[in-house]
């Protein structure tokens, strides 16, 4: 029993020791992490501000601002060549006292600005042409409306002239019919066709002392006998005027 109790005590002591060591290790790790971060931040501050802002900007040629003369020389080179070769780039950078990579970046940005400018000019031209096309379309639409109005007026005038011509023709035909009825003429078709006695007037033969016209021998009409006519209407016509 004593041995069993000693083993339990040893196990408890070992477990407590292991737990304490683990807790200590975790505490050390948790305490070292913020210290490492602080050291890194301090180191970064020292690197950024140890030499001063003027020394960093002035000492590093990549971060130096370009002077007016350098910009002018780069612009002249860009007008001659849009994209520089490696040898030309290195030579120009050595002449201007710049880094070849900085010259390459400047040319890349300058090409992008040049392309944007060309796109803006092209857009301006297209917009101007679009506005002109819209204005021309409006003029054409107004012209179409005016032509439609003129067409309506012309159609009304044509209808008016046609109605006037129709009424004039009808009145002229009525006058001709009245003139024929007043002259005493008789219009007849074939001898077998029927006719109205009201439209024809008998000719006046000269009687005794009537003052009428006297017919000569040449004016006499030879009328055959009654039995020679097959149509009774002709016979009636001749008998009506006393020719039989």
Curated annotation (Swiss-Prot):
Reported tissue expression: Expressed in roots, stems, leaf blades and panicles.
Family designation: Belongs to the HD-ZIP homeobox family. Class I subfamily.
Chain intervals with Basic residues compositional bias: 35-44
A molecular function GO annotation: DNA-binding transcription factor activity, RNA polymerase II-specific
Lineage per the UniProt record: Eukaryota, Viridiplantae, Streptophyta, Embryophyta, Tracheophyta
Major localization listed first in the record, in broad terms: nucleus
Species: Oryza sativa subsp. indica (Rice)
Alphabetical GO biological process terms: positive regulation of DNA-templated transcription
Record's keyword annotation contains Ligase: no
Keyword Cell wall biogenesis/degradation: no
Compositionally biased residues, Gly residues: 46-56
Coiled coil: 108-167
DNA-binding region extent: 59-118
Name of the featured protein: Homeobox-leucine zipper protein HOX14
Stated role: Probable transcription factor.
A GO CC term attached to the entry: nucleus
Keywords: Coiled coil, DNA-binding, Homeobox, Nucleus, Transcription, Transcription regulation
């Amino acid at each position: 029993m004593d041995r069993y109790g000693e083993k339990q005590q040893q196990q408890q002591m070992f477990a407590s020791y292991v737990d304490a060591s683990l807790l200590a290790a975790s505490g050390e790790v948790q305490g070292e992490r913020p210290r490492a971060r602080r050291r890194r931040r301090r180191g970064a501050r020292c690197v950024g501000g140890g030499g001063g802002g003027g020394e960093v900007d002035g000492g590093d040629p990549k971060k130096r601002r370009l002077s007016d003369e350098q910009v002018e020389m780069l612009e002249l080179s860009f007008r001659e060549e849009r994209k520089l070769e490696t040898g030309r780039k290195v030579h120009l950078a050595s002449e201007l006292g710049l880094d070849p990579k900085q010259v390459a970046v400047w040319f890349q940005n300058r090409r992008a600005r040049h392309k944007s400018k060309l796109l803006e000019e092209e857009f301006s031209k297209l917009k101007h042409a679009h506005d002109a096309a819209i204005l021309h379309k409006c003029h054409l639409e107004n012209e179409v409306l005016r032509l439609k109005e003129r067409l309506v007026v012309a159609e009304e005038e044509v209808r008016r002239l046609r109605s006037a011509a129709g009424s004039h023709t009808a009145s002229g035909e009525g006058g001709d019919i009245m003139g024929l009825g007043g002259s005493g003429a008789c219009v007849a078709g074939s001898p077998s066709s029927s006719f109205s006695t009201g439209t024809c007037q008998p000719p006046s033969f000269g009687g005794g002392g009537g003052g009428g016209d006297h017919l000569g021998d040449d004016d006499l009409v030879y009328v055959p006998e009654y039995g020679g006519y097959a149509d009774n209407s002709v016979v009636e016509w001749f008998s009506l005027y006393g020719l039989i």
